[in-house]
């Protein structure tokens, strides 16, 4: 039995998993495992629509377990990758705390992080758009600015409150 472990349940990790499921669908000698911090896939290109309130968050998430057929799935956070011992330790959630997963082949598809290139002012005065929570925070801030502008009598201050840079 060969064990393929995929770390990351975003676009790359899930697509890799689905392709491997399809390729090895009739091969009982292959065991696929997917680990992700979330139990859902988030369609991040639609986060601006969530922030603007034009769609609801439920429209851009799909449970991972509904998409995979042959793959074991674990929701958890990676604590340690041991390339020599061919194992990954998870912090995990619920009953899977401290779990150790062995593999023969490892796919690392852990996504990306926003890089502000050391520009602290940009980092402190901008909004990231990576998660549903990020979109909700931005939406709430825009609503707050619009409420403030609605009640502002000074036209210069009102204009400043409504100035948003994208």
Task: Give the positions of each predicted feature.
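FAD-binding core/adjacent interface of flavoenzyme oxidoreductases
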Residues: 71-165
């Amino acid at each position: 039995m060969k064990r393929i472990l995929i770390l990351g349940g975003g676009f790359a990790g899930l697509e890799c998993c689905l392709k491997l499921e399809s390729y090895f669908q009739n091969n009982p000698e292959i065991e696929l495992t997917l680990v992700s911090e979330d139990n859902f896939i988030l369609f991040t290109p639609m986060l601006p629509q969530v922030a603007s309130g034009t769609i609801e968050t439920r429209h851009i998430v799909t449970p991972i377990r509904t998409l995979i057929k042959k793959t074991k799935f674990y929701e958890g956070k990676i604590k340690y990758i041991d390339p020599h011992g061919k194992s990954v330790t998870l912090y995990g959630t619920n009953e899977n705390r401290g779990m150790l997963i062995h593999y023969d082949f490892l796919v690392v598809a852990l996504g990306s992080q926003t890089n502000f290139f050391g520009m602290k002012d940009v980092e402190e005065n901008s909004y990231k758009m990576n998660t549903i929570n990020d979109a909700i925070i931005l939406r709430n801030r825009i609503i707050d600015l619009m409420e403030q502008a609605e009640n502002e009598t000074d036209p210069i201050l009102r204009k400043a409150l409504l100035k948003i840079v994208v």
